[in-house]
């Protein structure tokens, strides 16, 4: 999978830079079954982890960044707007409270998928937070929650800037 070094977004133009091993090896009758990125975190049965709601985002990068900044959720990713967002992959969310955090411009698409989750999850909602706070430019870029989290300087970044100004 190719990522832009400056933005952290996937490279999709001039072509999608994803290479599947089964395609390269030309495996006959291969049936791929995708899972949610971070799904293994759901098997942690500790009281702290089992009580946390699940947050689902599109990108694996976004799940990692959000997990660093926001510890209140178990962050999972579908691997794209459509990714593994299907009833089979969502079965692992049985009995969980789930909040979807779609990228800008994908909120309505993900809202349409709520009934699929409501049949499995204890509770399922779709956040429109980004749509409410985004500028038109941010919306046109299709930013995600990680992009917003990374816009703010962290305390460590501020400290480094102060050291650079006052050696």
Describe the predicted segments one by one.
Residues 4-10, 46-48, 53-57, 68-69, ...:
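Replication-associated primase and helicase/ATPase modules
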Residues 1-94:
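Phosphate-handling DNA/RNA-contact segment within nucleic-acid enzymes
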């Amino acid at each position: 999978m190719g990522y832009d070094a400056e933005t952290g977004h996937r490279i999709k133009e001039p072509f999608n830079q994803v290479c599947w091993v089964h395609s390269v090896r030309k495996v006959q009758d291969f049936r791929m079954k995708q899972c949610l990125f971070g799904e293994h975190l759901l098997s942690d049965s500790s009281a702290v982890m089992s009580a946390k709601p699940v947050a689902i985002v599109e990108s694996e990068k976004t799940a990692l960044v959000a997990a660093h900044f926001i510890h209140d959720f178990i962050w999972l990713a579908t691997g794209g707007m459509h990714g593994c967002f299907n009833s089979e992959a969502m079965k692992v969310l049985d009995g969980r409270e789930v909040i979807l955090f779609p990228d800008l411009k994908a909120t309505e698409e993900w809202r349409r998928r709520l009934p699929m989750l409501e049949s499995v999850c204890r509770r399922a909602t779709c956040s429109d937070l980004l749509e409410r706070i985004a500028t038109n430019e941010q919306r046109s870029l299709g930013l995600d929650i990680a992009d917003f989290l990374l816009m703010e300087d962290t305390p460590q970044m501020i400290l480094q800037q102060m050291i650079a100004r006052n050696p």
